[in-house]
Amino acid sequence: MNDLIKLSVAKMHLALARREISSLELVEAHLLQIRERNAHTNALILVTEEEARQRAKLADERLKRGESVNTLTGIPCVIKDMYCTKGVRTTAASRALRNFVPTYESTVTSKLIDAGAVMLGKANMDEFAMGSSNTSSFFGPVKNPLKGKKGVDLVPGGSSGGSAAAVADYYSPFSLGSDTGGSVRQPASFCGLVGLRPTYGRCSRWGMIPLANSLDQAGILSRNVEDNAAVFEVISGYDRKDSTCAKLEPFKYNKNPDIRHIKVGIPQECKVSGLSSHIVKLWESTANILRQLGAEIIDVSLPCVEYSLMVYYIICSAEASSQLARYDGIRYSPDPSISASTISELYEKYRSVSFGREVKRRLFMGTHVLSSSGYADYYAAAKELQEEIVNEYSAVFEKVDVILNPTAPNDAFPIDGKLEPLEMYMNDIFTVPTSVAKLPCISIPVGLSEDDMPLGMHLTANYFAEELLLNVALALQNALYK
């Protein structure tokens, strides 16, 4: 393995600025790793070798001319395949979009291009971002590059599993994912990475193939906190093309890992039945580290942990069923092999063959909760409970600055583990409450499971308090990995 691919974004940037290496050298080193490893992990659906070389050469020309450049100029990256990339196939890992080539670029990927970042390829994912294991992709499951003591192929988490596996296996120093209910944070925990979900509205969703418009948010996976912050600085900021985007300037990170006098809340409801004693001990030891760094640890109550999963899946499935109505077999990726005498027959046949099992399951659920018989009992009730969840967090943040809990109730599980749908959904029990409340949160690796697989801890801050969130995560990282 070439040592170049192990460098952080900051070290790559410094080496590029000093002309010790070129962007093209960085790109070739990462492409070699992809060629050697991607057949095993299946982390990337598409590798854009020639486009990457062209962008690397442009970055090298800018550096050679001594132009003012961004931290990401010339740095390789991987993009989750739900972001529209102009002229580059974008599938959302679904048969329904297997031939879709966008004519426009998403806002966040445009910002990366403008900063000079070099896309190496599109990352595999759960189909339409529906999943927690990255086993529902039309292009096949993604394998976690780590195995620990289990000795079998493990999931990388989902739905941004390809983005996580790519960074963990050194295909790029960072990747762009998306997070609706935990799709960046849970893979970060399973693959030993830092995974940030910003406040809803911090980053534009324009050009992102939606799962649930009111919950989706761009997210970042990296191998350390500083790199994550550097990428967040680039992709954040107001976009008039997205009406839900907050009218804020792009984020500027003021690095300060001094967390003395910070109050950290420990939600008692996260001590759920069946949570392993090993994870509980790791949670307690993480809290003790923060205490030793000067933070005050306070027990808090978040009853919403017990019902947020229900609220999330009702709202998410309802919105997803509405979003997926656009895939009709006429636009995007028509299928000439399907013959039908009526439009209704075409819709039925196309969706039967184009959507996977998990997508169909959520479509049925979403259609039911939006029906005349289910709307009041399910969707309207879930929206009312969502307000209660927001109020609970608001009350807690009057007492503490950040909240600490495990990212997931377990480590990575076998790809062929055959979990039932409800068991799979329980993987998100600690991440969906903050998604429903639309708060910023981050997962940071803090240790290993009994099977030597990574485990992450989850930090949540108040709205638009990403700087505090990153600084607490940085303090924890510095203490754990001196």
Curated annotation (Swiss-Prot):
GO molecular function terms listed in the Swiss-Prot or TrEMBL record: ATP binding; glutaminyl-tRNA synthase (glutamine-hydrolyzing) activity
Group of enzyme by EC: ligase
Enzyme Commission number, as recorded: 6.3.5.7
GO biological process, one term: translation
Superkingdom in the source lineage: Bacteria
Catalysis: reaction(s): L-glutamyl-tRNA(Gln) + L-glutamine + ATP + H2O = L-glutaminyl-tRNA(Gln) + L-glutamate + ADP + phosphate + H(+)
Signal peptide residue numbers: none
Active-site residue numbers: K80, S159, S183
GO cellular component terms, A-Z: glutamyl-tRNA(Gln) amidotransferase complex
Keywords, comma-separated and alphabetical: ATP-binding, Ligase, Nucleotide-binding, Protein biosynthesis
SUBUNIT field: Heterotrimer of A, B and C subunits.
Family: Belongs to the amidase family. GatA subfamily.
Function: Allows the formation of correctly charged Gln-tRNA(Gln) through the transamidation of misacylated Glu-tRNA(Gln) in organisms which lack glutaminyl-tRNA synthetase. The reaction takes place in the presence of glutamine and ATP through an activated gamma-phospho-Glu-tRNA(Gln).
Protein name (database record): Glutamyl-tRNA(Gln) amidotransferase subunit A
